[in-house]
Each structure stands twice: as structure tokens, then as C-alpha cells.
Design a protein with these regions (language model features):
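Transmembrane-lumen/periplasm boundary regions of multi-pass, lipid-linked membrane glycan transferases
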Residues: 46-48, 174, 187-332, 342, ...
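Start-transfer (signal-anchor) and selected internal transmembrane alpha helices
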Residues: 1-26, 216-224
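Short acidic/glycine- and proline-prone juxtamembrane loop motifs at membrane-interface regions
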Residues: 92-95, 134-145
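Extracytosolic helix-loop segments that constitute the early lumenal/periplasmic catalytic or substrate-binding loops
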Residues: 24-29, 42-65, 72, 79, ...
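Transmembrane-helix motifs of polytopic, lipid-linked glycan transferases
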Residues: 93-113, 151
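Membrane-interface transmembrane helices that cradle and orient dolichyl/undecaprenyl
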Residues: 112-113, 117, 152-169, 179, ...
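Membrane-embedded architecture of ER/inner-membrane glycosylation machinery
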Residues: 2-7, 166, 170, 263, ...
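Transmembrane-helix signature of polytopic, membrane-embedded enzymes
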Residues: 12-18, 106-128
Length: 577
């Protein structure tokens, strides 16, 4: 077992500066934008409904139960709103706190296993990784479950590598259970026990040794299951007690269909990707930490010959996680995000060794210059009007021509930040130049680009227009709707389910219109209803995310017309965005 040097005031100051930088990078833009598709609006809508209805046990999406994910993230978003009273802040707050917590855990574990400096470098490696910045600036479940898996691995490592410390082991099992009720894959933290058992059996060094403690190991099972039971027991009890098809279907869907079918690639359309799929992800999405991969091979080989149990457990766990997701038919880049923190801890000795390497400094400086020139060139090309295809795509997404210029000016500013950092730091501090440029990029994205793209990415303007069209006494029902429509609406809206076929929604909505044809309106996606609607009697509410939205009353509906059912590909696309 390793005994790391005690931290000094200078080490703690370095951590404080790192967390301040992380707060700027991850927090820049919080409060300046609304939830963006595809997942952010649905989670924020569920959280908002929890607060308004008082029902926190069964999440709802409009009038129907939402069975796709356990409600852990939505609970935290709703709780955040109770504190800050601003949904633009509350929906992103759990991701921000999860990011800061992940960095502290990486720093502390690497500090204890290697040295305070190694801990700082490992945390910097995590913060600077492209996937970390991209994901932890969004309100997705993945940042939260990554924090929980990291906390579980941290607690297990405190026992397996720095112990014995049974309370840490039990805590790790408990947090892994919390990860399961956040997103089913939280269980992967417990895979750390397998390389530990193999390395201990082989007599490797740096591992906790216990004897006659089988009952203590066994207590990890109730700790794990107990965390799951905190949510599962009340949910199952209430659902079975109510016994309605809606609640029984919710229970079946969330317990069996979602996790198993997603792993098998039958939900979300992320199937058909080869075994090699995660290779480029680990290289590109974990950049710039991936610059250390080549040098880490030498350290891993040295650790193997030295029978270093620390590397065996950490790298063994990473390999098992990678194998787990590689074997799955359904694959997405973000699935390997939970690997990043422990991979950085395992690479900490390598980062410490190559920190001042000339090749790394020169490479980092060259990359900073390349990124800067690339962003400036992109902005200049777009602003010159010569890149017609790019402008066409952005206009299709609802961005007005007068909005493109400030967005690309911010892109140019991000490129200039890379170049300025390279000019100031030069080759002697090339790594600093690259890190500073990446930090500036995320800050510019948060405070410059995202707020200006917000109106086109969200349905805020469309829903305000729909509200004006209906008038103060009008009522609106949604057909073929998206979560952001209900979330951004300034008035209550009616729906006939989200997962129901648009044809069924439309049929029921038309019957509802007939009850008060002068007062009631249908708000619908154009492509979903145009076969049965006379466009001459339609009022266009607007366009967002390349979708046009219509408002119409009963006089626009073609008599005896029935909408066709969606094709499977169309249904998968609708479910995924």
C-alpha cells in the first residue's frame, strides 16, 4: 500500500485554483440559456412537474408517466429549483456540482496513491478532456452517474488499495446502488472487485489484505441493494397497490425494458457499431489526456513487472468497463465517460513524468496554434458569406441571418484566445497554452455562443407565438409534440400522451376541438399532420430545430381523414430527439 506525502498549504492552494478554474469553465453560461434538446427539456419538464404537482415518486411527461429513466436527476433539479427559484440555473446545477465533486475525488485519490502533484495533474487531465467539458456543461444524467461511479470507485479504492477500511467499502457498494437508480450502469463501479481479487490472488503489491472477514465482504450486498430499495420499494409498492395498467406498465418498462433493451441496442437507434467503436472515442473525446497514452504504455509495463496492485486495479477496472460497453450492441460515445476519472488516476504517474517533456510542450503548443487558426479561419469563412452550406444549415435550424454574425464573432474570439495563449506561453509552457485555450473555448461557448443560439434551439419563441395566436380565452392541445413545447409554454396545455402515435393523438384532439370549435386550437408539428390539414386555414406558429409548428382550429381539419402510422425509423428518430 502507498503512503502519499501529506498535502502542504501550497498543494491546497493549487486545488483551490483548479476548482476556481473548473467553476469558470463548467459554470460559464449557467442562467443564460434554456434546456436544449434532446434530453435537457424532458428532464427539466419532469422536474418542473414534480414541483408543481407535489408528486416526486412517479415522474410525469405531460399527462403520462415517464418511464425512460429513474428520477434521481429530476429530483436534484427540482430540489435545486427550491433553492435558487430559477429554472435556467436549477436545471444545470446538478451537473456543475457533479463536475466539481468528480475533480475533488480524482485529486484526492491520486494524491493518496501517488503524490499531491500527481493528484493535481490527474484532476487537470479530467477537467481539460473534451468530453468532460461538453457533458458536464449539459443537464444530462451522464454527469451525475459519472460522479456517483467515481465516488463509488474512490470509496472502494480507499479500502482495496489504501485499507483495509470497511466503512469505505460499504459506502462504495451503497453509492454503486445509488448509481443504479440514477442510470442502470451505475453497477459497473463494482467491477473493481474483480481485478483486485485476481491481483491479490497473484500476490501483487499495494493491496489491502484481510483474513476471516467474509461476513464483512458480504455486507456489501445489502449496502448495494439497500440503496436501490430506497427508490424501488416505495415505487413498486405504490404501483402494485394502485394496480392500474398505467402504473404496472411504468414498473415493467423502467425495471426491465429500458436498461436491457438499451444494452441490446433496441432503444435509441445506437446499434450496429463495431467492436472498435470506442477506440477513436478514447483518443479524441478524452483529448488532451490521450496525449499521455503512448508514454503510459512504458509505465504500465513497469508496473506489471513490479507487480503494482494499484495499476492492476485501476487499469483492470477501466478495461472491464470498456469491455462491458464494447460487448453491448447499443453504443454511444458518452457511455465511456465514467472511465475518464479512474483512467486519469491511473495515468497520474505518467503525467508527473512527462509534465516537463519537451515533446509534450512542443506538441501542445502546436495544437494550440492549430486550434486557434482553425477557429479564426472558420469564423472568417462564415462571416465572408462564402460558406453557403453552413449558413443554409444554420438558417434551417432557425437562426436568423443577423444572429449568425455575433455567433461567429464569438467563434473568432475563441480562436484568438488560443493564439494569444500560445504567444504568451510559447514552447516553454506549451501545455499551459493548450489548457488556457481550451478553458477560454468553453467559457466563450457558455457566455457567447449558447445564449445567442438559444432562441433557435429552444421553442421559447414558438410557444410565445402560439400563446398569442390562441388569445387569452383560447385553449390549446398538442399533437406530435416535444417536451420543450410544454416546458416553454407560458400557459397550461392539454395533451393526449407523448408516446401515443400522432394519428391517435390527432384523432382524439379533433374530437376535443368539436366540443368548443371557436375556442380550441391544435398545436402540431407540420410534417406529422399536414396530410389531414388544409394549409390555407393554418396559422404558422414558427420554426425551431428544423421543425415547423402549426396552429389551427376545426375548420382546417379535412373531414374523415386519418393520419398514417409512423414508420419504425420515424418513431426512433422522434424518441431520440
Amino acid at each position: 500500500m502507498s503512503t502519499a506525502a501529506a498535502t502542504t498549504p501550497a498543494d491546497r492552494r493549487a486545488l483551490a485554483w483548479l476548482l476556481l478554474a473548473a467553476l469558470l469553465v463548467l459554470g460559464a453560461g449557467i442562467g443564460l440559456r434554456d434546456p436544449w434538446p434532446s434530453d435537457e427539456p424532458r428532464f427539466a419538464l419532469v422536474a418542473k412537474t414534480m414541483v408543481e404537482s407535489g408528486d416526486w415518486l412517479f415522474p410525469r411527461r405531460g399527462s403520462e408517466l415517464y418511464p425512460d429513466k429513474p428520477p434521481m436527476l429530476m429530483w436534484l433539479q427540482a430540489a435545486s429549483w427550491l433553492v435558487v427559484r430559477d429554472w435556467r440555473v436549477a436545471f444545470l446545477l446538478p451537473s456543475l456540482l457533479a463536475g466539481l465533486g468528480t475533480l475533488v475525488l480524482v485529486w484526492d485519490l491520486a494524491r493518496r496513491l501517488w503524490s499531491p502533484r500527481a493528484g493535481l495533474l490527474a484532476a487537470i487531465g479530467v477537467l481539460s478532456a473534451l468530453m468532460f467539458g461538453f457533458q458536464f456543461k449539459r443537464a444530462q444524467i451522464d454527469p451525475l452517474v459519472t460522479f456517483e461511479i467515481t465516488l463509488a470507485c474512490y470509496a472502494l479504492a480507499r479500502h482495496l488499495l489504501l485499507g483495509p477500511a470497511w466503512r469505505w467499502y460499504w459506502l462504495g457498494c451503497f453509492v454503486a446502488g445509488l448509481g443504479v437508480i440514477t442510470k442502470g450502469v451505475g453497477v459497473i463501479a463494482l467491477l473493481m472487485l474483480l481485478p483486485y481479487a485476481l491481483a491479490r490472488r497473484a500476490g501483487w503489491h499495494g493491496l489491502a489484505h484481510t483474513q476471516g472477514d467474509g461476513w464483512r465482504w458480504a455486507l456489501g450486498v445489502p449496502a448495494f441493494l439497500g440503496a436501490i430499495a430506497l427508490w424501488l420499494v416505495p415505487v413498486a409498492g405504490v404501483a402494485l397497490a394502485r394496480g392500474t395498467p398505467e402504473y404496472l406498465d411504468y414498473l415493467r418498462n423502467i425495471l426491465f425494458d429500458q436498461t436491457a433493451r438499451r444494452y441490446a441496442g433496441q432503444v435509441g437507434g445506437h446499434y450496429g457499431k463495431g467492436w472498435w467503436y470506442f477506440g477513436p472515442v478514447l483518443l479524441l473525446h478524452f483529448f488532451p489526456l490521450s496525449l499521455a497514452y503512448g508514454a503510459a504504455v512504458r509505465d504500465a509495463a513497469a508496473g506489471w513487472h513490479a507487480r503494482d496492485g494499484r495499476l492492476a486495479v485501476l487499469l483492470g477496472w477501466c478495461a472491464l468497463v470498456l469491455l462491458f460497453f464494447t460487448l453491448a450492441a447499443g453504443k454511444r460515445e458518452v457511455y465511456v465517460l465514467p472511465m475518464l476519472p479512474m483512467l486519469a488516476v491511473a495515468l497520474a504517474p505518467t503525467l508527473l513524468r512527462i509534465e516537463q517533456a519537451a515533446w509534450l510542450r512542443r506538441t501542445a503548443l502546436a495544437l494550440a496554434v492549430a486550434f486557434g487558426l482553425g477557429l479564426v479561419a472558420l469564423a472568417a469563412w462564415a462571416l465572408s458569406g462564402r460558406w453557403a452550406r453552413l449558413q443554409t444549415v444554420m438558417l434551417e435550424r432557425g437562426l436568423h441571418a443577423d444572429e449568425l454574425r455575433p455567433i461567429f464573432l464569438w467563434v473568432a474570439a475563441a480562436g484568438a484566445a488560443f493564439l494569444l495563449a500560445a504567444a504568451v506561453c510559447r514552447a516553454r509552457r506549451g501545455v499551459h497554452a493548450l489548457l488556457a485555450g481550451l478553458a477560454a473555448f468553453w467559457i466563450v461557448w457558455g457566455v457567447g455562443v449558447a445564449p445567442r443560439a438559444n432562441a433557435s434551439v429552444t421553442s421559447a419563441e414558438v410557444m410565445l407565438a402560439a400563446d398569442r395566436i390562441a388569445g387569452p380565452d383560447g385553449e390549446i392541445v398538442m399533437v406530435a409534440w416535444k417536451e420543450q413545447n410544454l416546458l416553454m409554454s407560458p400557459r397550461p396545455l392539454k395533451d393526449f400522451g407523448f408516446r401515443n402515435e400522432p394519428a391517435e393523438q390527432f384523432e382524439r384532439a379533433v374530437a376535443w376541438l368539436r366540443e368548443a370549435p371557436e375556442q380550441r386550437w391544435i398545436f402540431a408539428r407540420q410534417v406529422a399532420v399536414q396530410a389531414c390539414v388544409d394549409a390555407a386555414h393554418v396559422t404558422v406558429a414558427g420554426q425551431s430545430n428544423r421543425r415547423q409548428w402549426w396552429m389551427f382550429r376545426l375548420d382546417a381539419v379535412r373531414p374523415a381523414c386519418r393520419l398514417p402510422l409512423r414508420q419504425p425509423a420515424e418513431a426512433a428518430e422522434d424518441d431520440g430527439d
